[in-house]
Structures are given as structure tokens and as C-alpha cells.
Amino acid sequence: MLGRTRRFALLAAAGVLIASALPAAAAQKQQQSEQEAQEQRRSTTDQLIDTPVEVDAAHDDQHGADEGHLPGSRHNVKRIGNADIEGAAPGRVADVSAFGNFAYLTVRDPERCSDAGVAVMDISDPRNPAQVGFIEATEGSFPGEGSQVVDLDTAAFTGQVLVFNNEICALGGEGGVSLWDVTDPMNPVVLTAHTGDNDPGGFVSEFNQIHSSFAWQAGDKAYVVIVDDEEFTDVDILEITDPANPVFLSELDLNDFDVAQEELLNNGNFQGSFLHDMVVKEIDGTWTMLLSYWDGGWVLLDVNDPANPVFINDSEYPYPDSLFPEVPFPEGNAHQAEFSTNDDFIIGTDEDFSPNRLDAFNITSGPNAGAFPGGEFGFTVPLATYPDGEINGPTIYGGLACPSNEEYGDQPPVPDASSLTVEPGEEKILVALRGLCFFSEKIEVAQQAGYDAVVIANHHAGAAFGDAPDASLCGSQGHEFTPEIAAVCTGHRAFHLLFNTTPEYGEGVDDAPAIGTLGEDVQASALFDGWGYVRLLDRSSLEQIDAYAIDEALDPDFAFGFGDLSVHEAAADPVEQGLAYLSYYSGGLRVIRYGNNGIREVGHYIHKDGNNFWGVETHFLPDSNKKLILASDRDSGLWIFKFTGRTDKRFERFVGRKANLNGTKEVPGPGDPDGKGMARIRLHANRGEVCYRVSWDKIGSPFAAHIHEGRSDVAGPVVVTLFQEEQPRPDKPRRMRDCVAGVDRALVADIVKSPRDYYVNVHNPEFPAGAIRGQLFNP
């Protein structure tokens, strides 16, 4: 999220030529066709909101202040403790991650471009968390989304690695992902300051700036996937088995798999099909990457071989919109997602900071009267705040409407607003053509000339020289000023019909009317379509099951003055299936239950002074069975909660399960026909701990015992190794007891709930595939 003035100044200083932006709706294919010539470049500074960094920047510049908050309240959620970061200020805090007794908050200040990094928080006493350290980001860079601590055990490194992204706010800043050794959180050590895609490198840095990252270990190797903000191939995967020497493996553009929905690219705000966030999880033996691809929806990749990812499937947004059926097309904006505990579902979030969209752009007089495609700018005064909820009135052409200055030279002035005569309830509206200067500069020129509203029409290139005559682009804010009027955008065809002329679309052809030409009357109104919300998908089909939003996000009375009421992130409960936690900006922390019957809210928390939650994670302190919910508040720091609603209490204590073992139960067999034994298993889901006592009789001494997944007629995979030795155990004692820690909590919970889906198997040299076996059950 770069400061506007700083971003364009630093690029100019670097001598970077920013090409004309192409329209989001019609020029996605045109952009793609230019990739080879532009070396796969996707500009983050072209005012086309088609990268995560531009979405974040547009959020900062959104029209309608995000001040205010919902009244304080709570239900089934208790605040345990909270702590401000040092130097807390609005918008300083981003994501949260945790390991052991420490949490990590990414901290940034993109406008001033200083004091960015990661705050290290001691949470050993969750009632009294405190900042105990700070990892500084490279000057000119700042972290944000996708902070993570990954526990690695490879030939090259054993310990915990903090992973965070780098966006750029000043010359000297560096992109890519950063890897820090935080095995000793009080003494972090940089392993790799920056790594990523450096072919050909970033606009102003060696590595392309990135928006998010996610790391995982598969077998004896480790990897990280990053969001490349500067190329169409925005899925970048690196090997970090040796985190001090990362190796770039592969890059993908998921639009090559036709994931984009054309209707979404033509409607709503922040149109574009690009990567925003991702997670990776092993599901049924396949390492599966779940990618949130904005208007492309959610995408699954097989990354068993990260150097050669394989497309699995992608989702489609349903028509009409789930929560606003009166809206013809959904907003899109797939922002973040997680797999459910049992991998049957996906909980995804749509981030949407604009609760209104343009209902219609209408020419209301003359021979060409009718409705035409268009949009509303996100940083100007909202149409919905006008007295009648719309703009309507006479128009006049103002040319490019660019300011005269050293950069643009002498520009023809726009006509003064006094040139137009209006009736009561009408607005004086300037029509400008896209090009030469920033959209925001055109709007400021109109504002200074006394106009009540602006219409900015697309130019020939934006209309693909006639192939996309109705394509429009409501771009982002390009310079600092205070908007005081509304602005809408429309296509090049509507521009000519407005002035009753015929477009020629030729390259280099000037077919615009003379400055000062009076046009027909126009009308544009806003349609409330809600803030961003949550979607529940079936993981196998990627079909949507349900959608959810807080009540206020669906109410136009809360469109302004209550902060951002969009969801941001979801965190699936790691133990209890069907429970998840949501960071909901000004909507606070939300707790939902989900399943085949849909989504319902079961808890929430909003402080009396309001909250602004960005990140959310679940966490267990070492040797604790108490689940914590960690949330990062953008304006303060770390907040720690617990859910006090109904949960499965079996997961909070040791629960016993049993298996009677014999050789006749082996599948496919044979087992030892004389063998028998017993397994007593004690399971603690919240601790991720499995304790066992396994005894055997009338078999040769075993060298291993496992818990396998599978019903009684199945030879299933090992899920818990109880013991595994190179040589058989001594003849006596004919039993073994111990505890296994660090077992996946969701797995332990599933064994507790469904013991007959698992069995215990004992192996010896005579029967290496299994001497005796028995199905687990609840005694």
C-alpha cells in the first residue's frame, strides 16, 4: 500500500516509463497479449486496480471516510488480554502469526515509509502480552499480509523460520520474501533478507515486490509460495530447504487456465483476476495449494512437484449474487481462504470496501438516450451521499482536463462551471477524456472549476481501438488532494453518443468534440451491494454451499460512518470441525459454525471503543490445552481471546480408546494366526498428544507399532507412529508404553470422534506388513 505521491515520484526518479493503463473489463486479453513484449510485466502504478498492492492502496483512498465503528458488544467470546505495539497509530499493524510463547505482528507505515518490520510479542502470559523485540524491515520496504512462522526440520536447518512479504514505498526498498531464524525469538537472525523473482527484477528493486507468502515442509524439503505484484505470472514458488540459500522453482499465471469470469471483470469494484493469498495442505496424499485469485475465484493446484504445479479446479461465483439477488453480478474479490479441519470444505473471504456500485449510467436526453456501462470511482464523494442519491444534469466537454504544470506543460483550461445552467436538484457535470494525467488530477481540475461531478470517458486505446467500445476504467487515485465531488467512468462509445458524434477509434485519430461543446443530460445512481463477505465451498466440487455477512454489512444504513464492515480473513479451528474465526475490520471478531447446512454466527466481540481487526489465528501455548484466538488490530496491536460457546469438551482432556489385537484381523494378511494383544490409547486433541500402552503375546518381538487410518477391511496409511525401531525389541517385557507429542490436532480429534475409522497394527520380522491388528473403539 504505497503512498500515492511517493510511489509515482520514486518511479519517476528511477526512470521507469509507466505505460497507459488498459481497462480492467475489456482489456484483460489485450494485457495478456502484450506480456511477451513487456516481459510479463503487470504495473503496480498504472491506476488499473489489478494487483493486491493497488487494491490495498485503493482501500486507503476509498471514498467515504472509514471513521466510526459499531457499538461495543460481545457474545460467547472473552477477551483474555491485549497489548499495543510501540508507536501504535491508525493503520500501523497488519498480520499476526505465532509459535510457542511468542506472536509476531507485521508493522508498517507506507505513507512515511519508516519504522516498518515485525513486532515480537511475548504471550507466555496471555493476560499480559507485551512487545519484547522488533525485527526491522529493509529501509524503503514494509511487510503486511502473509506473516507466518514455519517449523522446519531439514538436512540444512532445524528450527523456526519467520516468513514475511516485502512491498516497496521508497527508492532503496527491496521486494521478495524475507526469512528469519526465530528459534530464539529474543535473538532473531536473518537467513535470507530478500529472495523472489529477479528475472528481470522489480521496477525499482532486484526482486519483484510481493503481497503475501506461505511456506510448508513436504518430506525432507521445504518451499514457499509468494504473490508476485509485478508480473502476470504472479504465482512464484521457491525451495527453502536451506532457508539461507533459496532456489527459484516455478511461476504461473492462472489466467492461462481460464479462471477469470468475464462478467466479474466487467462489474463491481477493483476488477481483475490476480493472486492475492494462498495456503498449502496435504490432502489424501496430495500437497494441495488453495489460491485466492480475486475475480478468478478460488483455485486448487497439485504441488506434489512444486517445480511443475498441476491445475486441479477453480470455483465460479454464482449468479445472481447469493446475498444480493437483485444485483445482476457478484462482486468477486476472492481475498483469502482456508481448508476446513477435515478438508471437506473451504472457507473463503471476499474483501470489498465499496458497499455501493454504479447502478446505471444513463444519457437522458437527445437521440441517443439510454443506459450504458460504467462505474463509480472509489476515492471520490459517493453518489449515495448526494441528496437524491444520484447525479443528474447537463454536461459540457472539458478535453483531457489536465493541469498546466512543468510535467504536462500548458494545457487548455476547462470551461468554467458557470457555462452550464441547471434546474433545482441538478448538478453541473464536466465530461473529460482519459489520458495524459491522473484520473484524480482531472477530478481536481473539475472541482476547482466549480463542477458538481465529473464523467471520465475511456480513450481509443482503452477501447481496444474499437474492439471494446463499452470498456470503462475507474482507476485509482494518482495524487494527493481532497475529493469534494463525485466521479463516474464510462466507455468511448457512450462518450461520442453523449455529444451526438461518431467515433473513429483510429490510432492517433482525434475525433473528440471541441472543448466547451455542450452535451446531452446524464444521470448516474448508486446501487447498494453490501460489504465483503464469507463463502463456504465444497472442496471436492468447489461449488458454493452458503454465504454469510454480518447484518450491518447488508444494511445500507451502515454504508458510511461505521468503519470498514468487510470481512478480511478466516481461520479454521485446528481441532474442532465446523468452527472458524473471522477478522472483520470494524465488525470485530466473529465466530461461525459451518457445514453442509450452511453458515451461522455463534459468537462475536467488539470493544466499546471499536476494533479494526486484520489478522486472525488460533494458537496453543506450549504444554497448554487451552486454545487461544489471536487477532491483530490495525490501530493498536495484539488482542487475545477465547471462545466461550459450546465446544466438544472431549478435546480438552485425555480420552481413552482401545483395540483388541489378533493376527486374523490383518488385511490383506496373513498375520500371525496365534498372535494376540491389546492397545490402550489415550488421546488429547488440544495438546496434539497420543499416549499408548501396547502389549502382545505369542508373536515374535516387534520392531514397530502404528495407528493406521482405515476401516476393518482396509489396509490404510500410517497416521501415528507409536514406536519404530531398527531391531526387534527384547523378548521381555512384552509390552511398550510411551507418549507421542506433536501429532496433528485435527487428526487426534478425529480419532477421538471416529475411532472405528482407525486401527492399531504391530509389526515384526516374521510379519513385516503386520502380525496383529485391531480396530479402535470407545470402551
Question: Where does each model-flagged region fall?
Answer:
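Secretory targeting and sorting signals
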Residues: 2-27
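Structured lumen-facing ectodomains of secretory-pathway proteins
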Residues: 358-529, 533-538
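Metal-centered catalytic cores of metalloenzymes
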Residues: 331, 646-705, 709-779
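Acidic glycine-/aspartate-rich tracts in secreted/extracellular proteins
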Residues: 125, 184, 435-437, 459-462, ...
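Extracytoplasmic/secreted envelope proteins and their assembly/folding machinery
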Residues: 115, 144, 440-443, 495-499, ...
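Surface-exposed acidic, glycine-flexible loop patches that form ligand/cofactor-binding
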Residues: 152-156, 411-426, 525, 580, ...
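Short, ordered loop/turn segments at secondary-structure junctions
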Residues: 167, 351, 435, 458-462, ...
